[in-house]
Amino acid sequence: MMQRLRLARRGLALSAVRRQTVVPEEEPLDAYEREHLKHRIEITPFQRMLLGAGSSVAAILDPRRHDMIACLGETTGEGALWNILDTMEASEEGQRILIDKPRIHTSTIDFKRLETLPPDTFGAAYVKFLKDNNVTPDSRMPVRFLEDPKLAYLMTRYRECHDLIHTVLNMPTNMLGEVAVKWVEALNTNLPMCYGGAVFGAVRLRPKQRREYLKRYLPWAIDNGKRMKPLMPVYWEQRWEQNLDLAKKTSPIMLPALRITRRDG
């Protein structure tokens, strides 16, 4: 019965998307929905299957193909995203995120203010992570192959929060750190793309890294991934001033991070 209700709900949601596309004035679109319509590419189920298969092969052969990784996430993640939506709607904090649709990039976050926060706060740790790893929140690709705007936003949210998860877990952006974070995200979100990145990313580890991965990182990542509360309903932007070390000790959302040494490289 629950499965039938969920399928009916998804059908109604897709019908609503089509009505918005044809007669947008009847249901005013918010800023994210308007942006999503500019980038959205409608595809058939068969095209979705082909894109999913092709992007998975391309991503395995070359993990630097971020466009293929993004395509893989969108063409294989719809079922997991519906479950994430249910989780978000069951949480007060998640409901606020769905209403506000916050974005994480340099035009929406006051990074100058975050730099002035005490070094033990989440906001300061996030800025330090970006600088230390030479990454920017502006590099995420727009969602193109998800029709429902709610699911498209959740995929966008997942992408934009990825570096925040790195920060919380104290993981660098090298292959070893990425694989560990992907395991945590996979077990927390059930997104097929995350499982793929975790499994096939580990294959590309160097022998020394693989030993560390099997001995320390993999058990740690699986334990954290299973024990953490859902990460998607976390309104990270309202936690910039939170003490990161205290949060890791007291919150089931932020568990103690694995100690990283230079030899892990």
Curated annotation (Swiss-Prot):
It is a peripheral membrane protein. Keywords: Lyase, Membrane, Metal-binding, Mitochondrion, Mitochondrion inner membrane, Ubiquinone biosynthesis, Zinc. It is found in: Mitochondrion inner membrane. InterPro entries: Coq4 (IPR007715), Coq4_euk (IPR027540). Its main location: mitochondrion. It is an enzyme of class 4 (lyase). One of its GO terms (cellular component) is extrinsic component of mitochondrial inner membrane. Its EC number is 4.1.1.130. Zn(2+) binds at residues 162-163, 166, 178. Pathway: Cofactor biosynthesis; ubiquinone biosynthesis. Its cofactor is Zn(2+). It catalyses: a 4-hydroxy-3-methoxy-5-(all-trans-polyprenyl)benzoate + H(+) = a 2-methoxy-6-(all-trans-polyprenyl)phenol + CO2. GO terms for biological process: ubiquinone biosynthetic process. Belongs to the COQ4 family. This protein may be expected to contain an N-terminal transit peptide but none has been predicted. Component of a multi-subunit COQ enzyme complex. Lyase that catalyzes the C1-decarboxylation of 4-hydroxy-3-methoxy-5-(all-trans-polyprenyl)benzoic acid into 2-methoxy-6-(all-trans-polyprenyl)phenol during ubiquinone biosynthesis. This is Ubiquinone biosynthesis protein COQ4 homolog, mitochondrial. It comes from Drosophila willistoni. The lineage of its organism: Eukaryota, Metazoa, Ecdysozoa, Arthropoda, Hexapoda.
